[in-house]
Regions:
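Glycine-rich cofactor phosphate-binding loops and adjacent beta1-alpha1 units
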Residues: 166, 209-282, 345-346
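Short N-terminal strand-loop motif that marks the start
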Residues: 1-63, 129, 341-346
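Mid-domain Rossmann-like dinucleotide-binding core that forms the NAD(H)/NADP(H) cofactor-binding site
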Residues: 81, 136, 142-224
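Rossmann-fold dehydrogenase core element
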Residues: 257, 270-309
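Glycine-rich beta-strand-centered segment in the early N-terminal region that forms part
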Residues: 20-34, 48-101, 142-144
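NAD(P)H dinucleotide-binding glycine-rich loop of Rossmann-like/cofactor-binding domains
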Residues: 91-177
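C-terminal hydrophobic helical "lid"/dimerization subdomain
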Residues: 1-3, 246, 290-346
Length: 346
């Protein structure tokens, strides 16, 4: 089978690998679509993502969907041809979490994640024609949800987890700072979950136009002099830019809540945080998701429209070009998809 493999900084190849065979409790998926995430771009450009550094070649990709190709022994309730997506996290240790983390499996210290070099050996992702997965990682696609849209269930789950961390949204005014793919999906998720007015802010006009199509009631283009709104009760920071923290905290109302969903850099960086104290702002981190991928599929089936986010599609063999477009701010890309194989559908 063909697979998109990163070998080091700037070195991504379409390699030929053995076709997988399902083991006990496993299913092989014939992949159809994959969405490129910022971590995929980082592995390609820098040979790592965050603290995870490549030590050997890695198949990229954790935003994927396809159809069941074969079923291993002991697997029930799964049919060949069934359209599915994948929960990309797999616990690899029986270590119990402390009580304060009950149910928060996204915070378990021993998790294998599709397309991640965090553990050794690394965990290959799903940018390949076939991938064997544990049956309990499958999430069947509801009727009416194509595999193309199903590939966006994982990033939508990240957005939904952030929304869940914020509490009830009904009728609230919400600011989303950073309208890249995750920020845009936070806009869509917040609006779908009943937020009143949703304001999106970014430095890029094309990203803001996508955010409008996903439900933003107002947009602020910071590159042309627009300012952030004042005294917003609930703010999502999705840019991950340390320089944005001061202005975003200042835009948060006294006693308000700031949900940090954009990954911040691991190295020290200057940031103006005084308002965090003087305004008694509740600053909440949001990391990946628990099982909001199931909720994401339900929302997609209920009409949450993610299509405006998809701006580019490439064939698997053109993965290097796809990564370059996803990495290039001048490309005005939203979500870049790879056609991985099968009878792909729009």
């Amino acid at each position: 089978m063909r697979a998109v493999v990163v070998h080091g900084p700037g070195d991504v190849r379409v390699d030929l690998l053995p076709d997988p065979v399902p083991g006990d409790g496993e299913v092989v998926i014939a992949m159809e679509w994959g969405g490129i995430c910022g971590s995929d771009v980082s592995y390609w450009r820098h040979g790592g993502s965050g603290t995870a550094v490549l030590k050997h070649p890695l198949v990229l990709g954790h935003e994927v969907a396809g159809r069941v190709a074969s079923v291993g022994r002991g697997v029930t309730g799964v049919e060949v041809g069934q359209p599915v997506t994948v929960h990309p996290a797999e616990l690899v240790s029986p270590e119990a979490l402390p009580e304060r983390l009950a149910g928060r499996t996204n915070l378990h210290p021993r998790v294998r994640y599709f397309g991640s070099a965090a553990l050794h050996p690394h965990t290959d992702g799903g940018f390949s024609e076939f991938r064997a997965v544990r049956a309990d990682q499958l999430r069947p696609l509801p009727d009416g949800v194509s595999t193309r849209r199903g590939a966006l269930a994982e990033p939508l789950a990240v957005a939904l987890h952030a929304v869940n961390r914020a509490g009830a949204l009904a009728g609230r005014t919400v600011l989303v700072n950073g309208a890249g793919p995750i920020g845009a999906l936070v806009v869509a998720a917040a609006k779908h979950r009943g937020a009143g007015t949703v304001i999106a802010a970014d430095l890029a006009g094309p990203a803001l136009r996508i955010a409008e199509r996903l439900g933003a009631d107002e947009v602020r283009n910071l590159a042309i002099g627009d300012s952030l709104p004042a005294d917003v009760e609930l703010v999502f920071e999705a840019s991950g830019a340390p320089g944005a923290l001061g202005p975003v905290l200042h835009a948060t109302a006294r006693g308000g809540t700031l949900v940090q969903v954009g990954n911040l850099p691991g190295e020290p960086a200057p940031a103006a945080l005084g308002d965090l104290v003087t305004r008694e702002i509740t600053w909440i981190g949001s990391y990946r998701f628990v099982d909001e991928i199931t909720d994401a599929l339900g929302d997609l089936a209920a009409g949450l429209d993610v299509d405006p986010l998809i701006t580019h599609t490439f064939d698997l063999d053109d993965a290097a070009a796809a990564l370059a477009v996803a990495a290039d701010r001048k490309s005005n890309s939203g979500k870049v998809l790879l056609r991985l194989g099968g009878e792909v559908n729009e």
